[in-house]
Each structure stands twice: as structure tokens, then as C-alpha cells.
Amino acid sequence: MQDLLLAKVESAMQASQVSALAGQTATVTKVSAATNLATITPTAAGQAPIIVKLDATRQVVELQALVGKTVMVGKTPAAIGGIGNWIALTPVTGAKAAAAATGAGQLVMMKVEGTAAAVNLPALAGKSFTIAQPPVAAGTKAAGMLYLNPVGGGDLIAINVQNAATQTGGLVGKTFVVAPSPVIGGTTGKFLVLKPLTAGAGKAVGGGAIAAKFIPAAVTGTGGAAAVGAGSASSLLTAGAGTVTPITAAGTGSAMLSAKGLGLGLGLGLGAWGPFLLGAAGLAGAAALYVWARRRHGTPDLSDDALLAAAGEE
């Protein structure tokens, strides 16, 4: 993101005069440290220079660095909570001018409350967020918090700002990039600056954000749902998994198996499943399984007496 310069000026009239050039280029022709006056001259012929009075010495120094350079004039930031009058200038060179004009949009500015919030503002600069609906319980009023939902996924960020409860409702659902906070009369910026993100970019990234929030929930934790991880569904759908056989109806029972049960299970041609099935089904179940196993291998059925005799010999 190009270096966006926000300057606080003396009056609303000065801010509106500069804002009338929004989307156009201009040159910072003069900045006086003695009077705090700055002269901005439109690039287009026939337009008169605009003189504004800067609010702080720090901003005088910042604009002095732009003297003789071309800037893209932005719309006057929508300052929430009566935090003064501002102008927005973005340095541009050659081909960057067209890109800056295309992405021009009205900035939104609000003052944060509390030192902790101000200290954390630099970490948000350059990142994209969607303004979220305040999580307010029924019958209560929203606190002075602005909720930022990171584009691409992440924890919801709550920032205490002035007049949030009454003047930020129109921002909900919109996506912005956080711009660097201007510093006035101190060492830390106290202003949250939101730059509109293009609709196409916001939708493209936002679609991925939904997946990022829900996918981790399916693979975290130690509960039963988490135990069914990736691959479990395919293992349940392997060939033959849905076939109903007498083994399925063997029931549940003890897993403690004797040597006799092991021998009978293997003798029935059930392989390693024999001990578990016999332990669950008991002697009567073994007889039924014996009949099923003989039919499976094409062996003629035995009489009831022969069947009981075979089971008794084990």
C-alpha cells in the first residue's frame, strides 16, 4: 500500500476545498513552518491553488517532505465523533497515479479510547477486516466497541472507539484496509483509519475466510466427532462394508476367550474373527455360525445330532 498521508486542517471549508479535487492529482508547492500553511496546486490547468492551515508541527514536517512532488487527492475522510477536519493525500509517480485513482474511496476515521488501543493500532496497519455486528445480548445496548473480523480468518478484534454505538452501524458488513494512524501532538497515533477495499477483492478473500473458520473446528479437540478424522468416511464406504452377514448379528459379550473358543473359531474357517464372535455368541451362537460356515464353503448340512456332537468334541 502506498504511503497515505492524513493531515488535520483548520476548518471544514479547507477540507471541503481539497476534497473537491478527489481523484485528481496535485502538487504540494509550499509548506511554511512559521505559519503552518501549506499550498496545494491542482495539476489540471485553470484551477486555483488551495491553501490550508495544518493543525500540528509534525504534519508540517510530513508535508514539507512532499514539496514539489505529485500527490493523489483523496476524499475527505468521514470523521466519526467530531475529531476534526482532515485531508487525504497519497504520493504517486507515473503509472501509480492511475492505480491510486482507481482505488480511491472515502476513508473512515475514528478516535480510539485508551492507551492500550492506541498502542496496538500499528499492528493492524495494512491488514484487511470486515466490520462485524456487535455481539449484544437481548435487552442491552452495544458498548462503545468496533468489532473487526480479519479477512482470511482469525480472532475477532474489538477496539474501543468514540461514538461507536451510535455512528458505526452503517459500517457493518463492509470491508476495509487499516491505514497507518496519523500522529498529532504525541508519539502514538490515536486514530483508527479505514480505507475501503474494492468489492471484488473483498469477496474473493472473504470466500476463503469462511472455510478457514470451519475446517479447523472439524479436526481439533479430543471428542468423538474429532476422532472421525479425514479418511474415516472412505474407510466406512469400502467394498463389502455394508454387507449384512450372520457375523453382524453375533451380538456383544465378553472379550475373554479360552483356548477351546480359539480352536473352534479357527476350525469354523472364521480366521481371527472366530475368538471374538464365539466369546460374544456362546455355544448356541457357535452352532449357528458353524452351519453358516459350512454352507459358505459348500459343505452339506449336518443333522442336529451331528452338529451337537461336533460342538461337544471341542
Curated annotation (Swiss-Prot):
It comes from Paramagnetospirillum magneticum (strain ATCC 700264 / AMB-1). GO terms for cellular component: magnetosome membrane. Its main location: membrane. Helps regulate magnetite crystal morphology, probably in a single growth axis. May help control oxido-reduction reactions surrounding the crystal lattice of the forming magnetite mineral. Probably binds Fe(2+), may play a role in nucleation of magnetite crystal formation. Expression in a deletion mutant restores growth of spherical (wild-type) magnetite crystals. Increased protein levels allow crystal growth in the minor axis but not increased numbers of crystals. It is found in: Magnetosome membrane. Changing residue 304 to A: Isolated MIC makes smaller magnetite crystals. It is a single-pass membrane protein. The chain crosses the membrane at residues 264-284. GO terms for molecular function: metal ion binding. Fine-tuning of the expression of this gene allows regulation of crystal growth along the minor axis; this can be used as an alternative way to synthesize magnetic crystals with a desired shape. Residues 1-263 are cytoplasmic. This is Magnetosome protein MamD. Residues 261-270 are annotated as: GL repeat. Residues 285-314 are lumenal.
